[in-house]
């Protein structure tokens, strides 16, 4: 594992963008699974200025690693919609380079990735509860590949307020996510973390026991893991 601690969110975003660009600059096909949410917003802003209008990045293919469909609506779900707003549309990513995981195709997702050469890099955020992708405490098992989970109980509130602007009418019955086994199969992982609210989670993930109670703790076992965190997020780590 390699850990980079930056001064602030802006530096974290810039360093992460350049790390991602290093993979995108290869001359062969590059497969990248990337995260939505608030943490990567700055990273995508930097990255857009570096790749927009440059056809030599057309060898890069982008995958979402989870998806929440909108109840009662045809078309794309929450994650791809957010990734379009954050990066695909501003950066001018071609439609054929966007590889969508959906509630309809998730059963074939791992086989599809294997046929296409696997993932070169997965860019992950970290939840304050230690979740990654759609792998939540008390839900995920480490042996799972791409999987469908029901949305029920307290998760209905989490999805409604966290992903759907509080609109309970849009909450679906289930969502899909790449499970721990699928993520661990990627060649390289990058976790980006910002803010004091993630400090305890980052400590648990990197320096605590590997346990399904903290799903992202399994990532410390990956042979090629990079973590980029700002000082606030790294404040609880035992360094030295």
Swiss-Prot record:
GO terms for cellular component: cytoplasm; cytosol. Pfam families: Glucosamine_iso. InterPro entries: Glc/Gal-6P_isomerase (IPR006148), GlcN6P_deaminase-like (IPR052960), Glucosamine6P_isomerase (IPR004547), Glucosamine6P_isomerase_CS (IPR018321), NagB/RpiA_transferase-like (IPR037171). GO terms for biological process: carbohydrate metabolic process; glucosamine catabolic process; N-acetylglucosamine catabolic process; N-acetylneuraminate catabolic process. The active site is at 66 (proton acceptor), 129, 131 (proton acceptor). One of its GO terms (molecular function) is identical protein binding. PANTHER family: GLUCOSAMINE-6-PHOSPHATE DEAMINASE-LIKE PROTEIN BT_0258-RELATED, GLUCOSAMINE-6-PHOSPHATE ISOMERASE. Belongs to the glucosamine/galactosamine-6-phosphate isomerase family. This is Uncharacterized protein YieK. It comes from Escherichia coli (strain K12). The gene is yieK.
């Amino acid at each position: 594992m390699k850990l980079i601690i930056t001064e602030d969110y802006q530096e974290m975003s810039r360093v992460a963008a350049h790390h991602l660009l290093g993979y995108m600059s290869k001359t062969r096909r590059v497969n990248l699974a990337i995260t939505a949410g608030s943490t990567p917003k700055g990273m995508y802003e930097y990255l857009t200025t570096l790749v927009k209008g440059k056809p030599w990045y057309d060898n890069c293919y982008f995958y979402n690693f989870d998806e929440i469909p909108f109840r009662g609506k045809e078309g794309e779900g929450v994650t791809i919609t957010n990734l379009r707003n954050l990066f695909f549309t501003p950066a001018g990513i071609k439609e054929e380079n966007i590889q969508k995981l959906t509630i309809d195709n998730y059963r074939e997702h791992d086989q599809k990735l294997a046929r296409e050469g696997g993932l070169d890099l997965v860019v992950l955020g970290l939840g304050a509860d230690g979740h990654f992708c759609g792998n939540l405490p008390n839900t995920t098992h480490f042996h799972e590949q791409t999987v469908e989970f029901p949305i029920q109980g307290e998760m209905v509130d989490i999805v409604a307020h966290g992903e759907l602007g509080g609109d309970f009418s849009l909450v679906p019955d289930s969502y899909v996510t790449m499970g721990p086994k699928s993520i661990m199969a990627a060649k390289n992982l990058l976790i980006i973390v910002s803010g004091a609210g993630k400090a305890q989670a980052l400590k648990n993930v990197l320096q605590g026991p590997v346990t399904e109670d903290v799903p992202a703790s399994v990532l410390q076992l990956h042979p090629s893991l990079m973590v980029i965190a700002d000082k606030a997020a790294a404040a609880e780590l035992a360094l030295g």
